Curated annotation (Swiss-Prot):
Residues 525-553, 574-609 are annotated as: Disordered. The keyword Phosphoprotein applies. The keyword Nucleotide-binding applies. Residues 525-542, 597-609 have a biased composition (Basic and acidic residues). Induction: By stress conditions e.g. heat shock. The modification Phosphothreonine is found at residue 173. InterPro entries: ATPase_NBD, Chaperone_DnaK, Heat_shock_70_CS, HSP70_C_sf, HSP70_peptide-bd_sf, Hsp_70_fam. Gene3D superfamilies: 1.20.1270.10, 3.30.420.40, Actin, Chain A, domain 4, Substrate Binding Domain Of DNAk, Chain A, domain 1. Keywords: ATP-binding, Chaperone, Nucleotide-binding, Phosphoprotein, Stress response. Residues 574-587 have a biased composition (Low complexity). Belongs to the heat shock protein 70 family. Acts as a chaperone. This is Chaperone protein DnaK.
Amino acid sequence: MGKVIGIDLGTTNSCVSILEGDEPKVIQNPEGARTTPSVVAFKNGETQVGEVAKRQAITNPNTVQSIKRHMGTDYKVDIEGKSYTPQELSAMILQNLKSTAENYLGDTVDKAVITVPAYFNDGERQATKDAGKIAGLEVERIINEPTAAALAYGLDKTETDQKVLVFDLGGGTFDVSILELGDGVFEVLSTAGDNKLGGDDFDQVIIDYLVSEFKKENGVDLSQDKMALQRLKDAAEKAKKDLSGVSQTQISLPFISAGENGPLHLEISLTRSKFEELADSLIKKTMEPTRQALKDAGLSTSEIDEVILVGGSTRIPAVQEAVKKEIGKEPHKGVNPDEVVAMGAAIQAGVITGDVKDVVLLDVTPLSLGIEIMGGRMNTLIERNTTIPTSKSQVYSTAADNQPAVDIHVLQGERPMASDNKTLGRFQLTDIPPAPRGVPQIEVTFDIDKNGIVNVTAKDLGTNKEQNITIQSSSSLSDEEIDRMVKDAEENAEADKKRREEVDLRNEADSLVFQVEKTVKDLGENISDEDKKNAEEKKDALKTALEGEDIDDIKAKKEELEKVIQELSAKVYEQAQQAQQQAQEEQGSQDSTVEDADFKEVKDDEDKK
């Protein structure tokens, strides 16, 4: 089996890792960073991903950030006359990470383990798998982020039994998972969370504060100005990060707006205590799922051996303090919160390929699954925090005499009424033979695979007629849509490659023109007028070609000029060699000339005596 990469597809940042020997290694992107912003931008038909896309977000309205928050929904982004689904945009980020891994490995990568928040529902998980497929990746496994973090933390601690609480506060989602580690088995006991809570929300409270203060002082509402909002977002994110290390930071945004008397500047000092006051309700919101996870696992805080913090937002001192206060234990600081999830995904990839042995991962389904029954109630078949993969069956009957069909309304959630839970899908079992109500026996079976994706079957036990459905939420893509998007992604990748090649060719041609001009000037009298004229003509021809759009013409003219410069250089070397040879010959002839000399014998003084 070829290399399987581990990917943390994050809301604000993503990361890719590979197993080297027994150790997971985070792969740096071309900019040298270990994480890549989950940002996609479109400009003049070109797609940009990562840091380069994030840098121009202020001036480019066609920039998409935090798309992960819309996974599993029918949300679409309209850009330059085309609609993009969250799956397509996420695929562009995955393609970028895939390319980073391929450049590092020097080989094609087509398999991956991708992480998702533990609290992602079926539709969100399916959307993530679809994104992988569009990016040209076979998703070997969808793994929960806190579980991946625990894998990375506990790989070298398999000898000891530990109960670990993973507190994962990322850019857009929040999860708490409790795992039991021992003898190479990583068993998830419970999970809880909030898919709409993360670092973006902490940024937002700062943005709201800045907007409010600026309005008080200048009477201008910056929230109505898109460009100003983007600048505020960048400043808020930076201030949040600064306040993890210092107690006060200065937010300075000159020319943020204009008033009657000219340009307006935003200049505000933000203290850590003020930020903590603004974010207090968000921090409190993280505590409820933490308590729920402990309750579901049947554990008290004193039974937790270790607390692992995951996600960039856990760097906020107030978050760390809240966790410490709630659990009564200092959080473990030995893992990098931005990278540990991707590293865990790489370890799971190693388990799949057989490179990591004696490790067993037992994950759970985060939400209860069931169907709607009479009275609009939800009847639960699989309780939340059930270990997966799993299967559960239950027999139901008809509600009316001679009922010819039954509607199976598949639900996910914890509320007693069907309407309060999430609809995963609906299907019908038809052709039920006429019979009094309560007589037909309809067996409904729920199957959840290792990725947490649900398959439901309904079977008439009297006729053995069967109908099944792999849950497709309203946002799920059909095979045809995925195939089209895969093709689009491949074409875009090819177009991007061609654009890069064109830029490289033009740069090389520009450099060659400069080189020729310099060479001709340096050689001066050492080349003939004819050679000089030929070089000038070929150089001018290439310059003219560079002004046009014909790539083949640029390539041809570049090759012609390269040939001329090579011939010129060869001639110069030849001339230099001849001159050197001639000099040596002249020196040799001088050395071989022998002159006669007169010698006179001089006797010693003693001989004179």
